[in-house]
């Protein structure tokens, strides 16, 4: 399928201006006029935009830490990549749940992604193949160490989601793992006739729950609005 990509439009939206990458120079967010909040939003909620075009023309190497996550955006002028992960392996201080590593990343042009892109002008025609964004939720053990009296657990995916919730809310990962175990038994696609769905059984008003990322975002919104009372605590 032929598709025209306006690569510069994403750069304008992000406010990436006034920077020319030199050989071997790594540009941190502070060195260029970058809207960090918008980049973070793209990484968590609009991966398709980052997959479709680089954030600016030419080579760049941008890294910054925000809200407990390390964000990376790089390009050699021909291919580009982006990723985010928990900064500095921040799993210390979370009790009762095995340490987790959470990474979302996309590497345009890599062997794994099987995407072809020929960088020309910002209005060039490109031949592209749809590529997935990888979401890696993993724990060092095969199951959660939180187990309720009825046998429910948070499961591997739920334990990783609990770690991320702890980083984003300040509530312990063990508390979130217990909520996940009680609400969904660690089932990502759990659905209740009331309309509640996902690991955290959030209602539609808090946002979509098609992916684990969306389920985490919806749970964060519910927590910010109602605290743990959203889950009856």
From Swiss-Prot:
EC numbers on record: 3.2.-.-
SUPFAM superfamilies, per database record: Lysozyme-like
Keywords attached to this entry: Glycosidase, Hydrolase, Secreted, Signal
Protein origin, superkingdom: Bacteria
Enzyme class: hydrolase
Localization terms from the record: Secreted
Main subcellular location: secreted
Chain coiled-coil ranges: none
Secreted as UniProt keyword: yes
Gene3D superfamilies, per database record: 1.10.530.10
Family (UniProt): Belongs to the transglycosylase family. IsaA subfamily.
Protein name per the record: Probable transglycosylase IsaA
Phylogenetic placement of the source organism: Bacteria, Bacillati, Bacillota, Bacilli, Bacillales
